[in-house]
């Protein structure tokens, strides 16, 4: 029987600290959202902004800062898949590499699931729901300015759009925070300073990416701040509450084998989260429709989206409820 490592622990306090810091920073800096973004966009450092915004994985011709997080993700995927193969090929079992793969599998699954859930699903679903106009659209007089917590002028009935809130590039940079958590979970004793240094650098890298996006008039200050703190909090929750990585590691140390889980467990949870997103979108879009003239009938999407979301939330909950042997 394992006790929740978050009860009366630094991990819970850390989550509270992340959330409180994010709320405080947004509360203080929201009044300066428009003016600080305008200032940075008119005082841009072009070479810096262009490099930070580029990524060959997003069809850029030249590599850029956005490429830094993709090689570790690809490497994690290449290790994650064979980490399950020992179940089907006994010749792979027993060796040192097999032992390493199986013991490291929870961290590999955490890396892939967190990156998929936070940097992709959460960001793009929220973009479609909020519909906030980008700074360049506002500065050019094409669309009105709206606060980060308000419904923006974009709506799916107006055609395809990529909303400003939250920041996708900043969320991609925040994948570095995932790697820092992996380091902290892999190192012990005096070497943990490497993980803490990695965490500080990853937060700094995420913030710098956000500044570059503001310089290019692609995102508002609050887009960046919300993305940084929300992604960090979600990563923390997935690590300690959803996948319970410390408990999985402790189980392996005690028993010499991983907890019994379905094949590709973390990717299955990611797939369920993907299926959850349309329900969340439909529910929120139905609620937003009342503010767009002629589209109030879309309010009918709300109960449909709610039923869809509740169904897959239940599936996710059931998938997470299991008893280790």
PLM region descriptions:
Residues 148-298, 314:
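Membrane-embedded catalytic cores of phosphoryl/pyrophosphoryl-handling enzymes
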Residues 1-90, 127-130, 143-145, 156-157, ...:
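N-terminal transmembrane-helix/juxtamembrane module of multi-pass inner/ER membrane proteins
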Residues 15-29, 113, 117-118, 200-204, ...:
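Alpha-helical transmembrane segments
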Residues 289-325:
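C-terminal regulatory/interaction regions
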Residues 2-3, 30, 78-97, 180-189, ...:
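Structural signal for the C-terminal ends of transmembrane alpha-helices
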Residues 118-144:
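Aromatic-rich transmembrane-lumenal/periplasmic boundary elements in polytopic membrane proteins
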Residues 11-16, 106-109, 193-199, 264-272, ...:
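Membrane-interfacial loop-to-transmembrane alpha-helix junctions, especially the N-terminal start
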Residues 88-128, 192-199:
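Interfacial segments of alpha-helical transmembrane regions
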